[in-house]
Amino acid sequence: MSDTTTLTIEALFQRVESIFLRAGLNAVQSGALARVITAGERDACKSHGIYRIEGALRTVKAAKVKPDAIPEVAEDDGTAIVKVNAMGGFANPAFELGLPALAERAKRLGLAALVINDCTHFSALWPEVEGLTSNGLAGLVMCPSYSTVAPTGGTKPLLGTNPFAFGWPRKDTSPYVFDFATSVAARGEIELHRRARKSLPEGWAVDADGNPTTDPEAALAGAMLPFGGHKGSAIGTMIELLAGIMIGDLTSPEVLDYLGTTTLAPFHGELIVAFSPEAFAKGRPGDPFQRAEVLFEAIIGQGARLPSGRRFAARAKSESEGITLTAAEMAGLDRLLEKGLDAVS
């Protein structure tokens, strides 16, 4: 008997979507969640793949997210801001709903922003970024989380892991994309270390007393650290301001107060900013996309690689060969499909 199973991307999507439908989520929520989770597995981004299903279901079971939510786009007020209310559901369907209006407005005005309010967000941000680059737009995406990161010089959780992503469209090749937490590592990475009973690298976290630790359990009970010391701390604070306070949504401390735990997916807002390179470069010499390629080629020419290169390579492999899951992963999917919300506590 094989220890692995290989599925097509579509087959995995259907299986994941069925799990969410079985758990009582409507088609709008289930489809969007299944797309982003399948994309994570497709790109070998395991910390944002099927691993995330249980957390999403726990959040539904705890009644902290509405499984039947239908997101709504606010009436066009003539500004560059598109607003979508997730209506207490997940962020992913809200983004899918708002993307066409965001892209149209950014191309017409040169710059536009999508504000998503009242949403639960558990996924990576590169799917949003790639939604922009596929429309020929550059983009910035950010959101808070819940308090799990100590500010530089502090010892207690205050900031969120506060992910931040950027994308630049490229012709006839994969876009330039980076997506990272403003903590040293994503919280999901610490969870994966805990599950694998592996020690953390030094400098990732402190324990509940503020002492450095490499124990994942102690780290989860303590605080993570920002990347780059005071620089990461400042960027994390900026995200609290822009994607929390400025858009009238929750900051990471407020999210933690609302949830009362870090075991559920966080409830907050999300900010997506789209730029038209042609509009910004209009009237200036040179094509912005060609000039960008000169920069990218210079980076590669030094033996460096562009961010997300491994993810895009994994995507190409999955598209040609399928997605391979272990026996344990397949059993986990079967259990979730059979039991629905009863599979999580």
Curated annotation (Swiss-Prot):
Substrate binds at R52, T161, R187, G188. Keywords: NADP, Oxidoreductase. Its EC number is 1.5.1.49. Induction: Is up-regulated when the bacterium is grown on t4LHyp or t3LHyp as sole carbon source. Pfam families: Ldh_2. The active site is at S47, H48, E189. One of its GO terms (molecular function) is oxidoreductase activity. The keyword Transmembrane does not apply. It catalyses: L-proline + NAD(+) = 1-pyrroline-2-carboxylate + NADH + H(+); L-proline + NADP(+) = 1-pyrroline-2-carboxylate + NADPH + H(+). NADP(+) binds at residues 121-125, 179-181, 230-231, 305-311. Gene3D superfamilies: 1.10.1530.10, Hypothetical oxidoreductase yiak, domain 2 (3.30.1370.60). Homodimer. Catalyzes the reduction of Delta(1)-pyrroline-2-carboxylate (Pyr2C) to L-proline, using NADPH as the electron donor. Is likely involved in a degradation pathway that converts trans-3-hydroxy-L-proline (t3LHyp) to L-proline, which would allow A.tumefaciens to grow on t3LHyp as a sole carbon source. This is Delta(1)-pyrroline-2-carboxylate reductase. It comes from Agrobacterium fabrum (strain C58 / ATCC 33970). The lineage of its organism: Bacteria, Pseudomonadati, Pseudomonadota, Alphaproteobacteria, Hyphomicrobiales.
